[in-house]
């Protein structure tokens, strides 16, 4: 496993990090086995949230991490009433503090390494988050030692051109951002990553293999071609060759679609690529993507030529 610097936090994080959104409630023992295998493979950052499986993700993760202080944990506070793009903003500093206290109890930790405002999806709600006391509460928690570093994550389903992060990163308010980047939504490569480099903000990439549904995406050739078909149907891509060709993605061989997807992300100047791994078998598949190289310039150029115009996720 190779490691990269997480911006001005100075933390060294593994190129792959574990997204723990799913699996804890359906099979907690397998979830814990996977967490242990992930750590043994050298992965040292795990992402979770209070809203993942109604706190079960944090609780089972906390059980898995008992006695393991060499692992960085990132959790999140969602200031909305749901994950939907049109969810109502319900954030308050009191709720944020209560959320973090609950997360720490479930995680069996005195502090979390990274706290993110979860899924900030519009400039209007970013402004509210910054002015209604929520951001101030994050800063106070950091001063109290309950949080080491603070940041926000976006919701690319409603902000595919990353307007929120383009405002947030230069503000200097955040140490870390979580953003969407995959070869079917490449806009962050130009819109956000240069700003993060300029302002020394750590970058955690989410959804490297998913589209907006989070239930399908870049997991196989048929699934990836189905995503392309949906982009064509939505008018994001033209209904003509090569997008209608069954061999559209043959140029990625001999890599599997997940390997190519992860290598695409890691070919960029990001800190870590956060990916779900619900079994040790999926972990081994993902590890192949970081050994030994990233995508070559010609393949990156072809992916950009084919899909660089897409500006929204599809369900």
PLM regions and their residue ranges:
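Structured C-terminal cap/extension of enzyme domains
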Residues: 39-40, 44, 113, 191-315
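Generic structural signal for helix capping and beta-alpha/helix-loop junctions
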Residues: 25, 55, 81-83, 124, ...
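Local beta-strand N-terminus motif with an aromatic residue
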Residues: 13, 43-46, 70-71, 112, ...
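N-terminal binding-site loop/beta-alpha segment at the start of enzyme catalytic domains
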Residues: 1-75
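A general structural detector for well-ordered alpha-helical segments in enzyme core domains, enriched
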Residues: 2, 34-35, 57-64, 99, ...
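Active-site beta-loop-alpha junctions enriched in small/polar residues
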Residues: 21-23, 49-51, 76-80, 117-120, ...
């Amino acid at each position: 496993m190779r490691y990269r610097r997480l911006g001005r936090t100075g933390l060294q994080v593994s190129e792959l990090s574990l997204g723990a959104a799913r699996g804890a409630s359906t099979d907690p023992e397998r979830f814990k086995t996977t967490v242990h295998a992930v750590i043994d493979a050298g992965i040292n950052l795990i992402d979770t949230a209070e809203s993942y499986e109604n706190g079960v993700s944090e609780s089972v993760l906390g059980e898995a991490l008992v006695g393991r202080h060499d692992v960085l944990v990132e959790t999140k506070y969602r200031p909305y009433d749901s994950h939907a793009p049109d969810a109502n903003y319900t954030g308050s500093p009191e709720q944020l503090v209560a959320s973090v206290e609950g997360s720490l109890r479930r995680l069996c930790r005195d502090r979390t390494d990274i706290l993110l405002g979860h899924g900030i999806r519009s400039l209007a709600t970013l402004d509210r988050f910054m002015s209604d006391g929520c951001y101030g509460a994050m800063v106070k928690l950091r001063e109290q030692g309950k949080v080491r570093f603070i940041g926000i994550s976006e919701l690319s389903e409603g902000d595919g051109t990353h307007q929120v992060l383009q405002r947030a990163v230069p503000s200097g308010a955040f140490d870390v951002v979580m953003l969407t980047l995959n070869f079917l939504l490449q806009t962050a490569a130009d819109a956000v990553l240069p700003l993060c480099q300029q302002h020394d903000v750590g970058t955690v990439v989410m959804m490297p293999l998913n589209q907006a549904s989070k239930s399908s995406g870049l997991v196989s050739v048929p699934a990836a071609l189905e995503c392309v078909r949906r982009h064509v149907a939505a008018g994001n891509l033209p209904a003509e060759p090569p997008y209608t060709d069954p061999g559209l993605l043959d140029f990625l061989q001999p890599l599997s679609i997940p390997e190519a997807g992860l290598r695409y992300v890691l070919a960029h100047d990001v800190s870590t690529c956060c990916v779900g791994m619900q079994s040790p078998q999926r972990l081994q598949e993902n590890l192949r993507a970081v050994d030994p190289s990233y995508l070559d310039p010609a393949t990156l150029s072809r992916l950009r030529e084919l899909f660089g115009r897409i500006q929204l996720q599809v369900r």
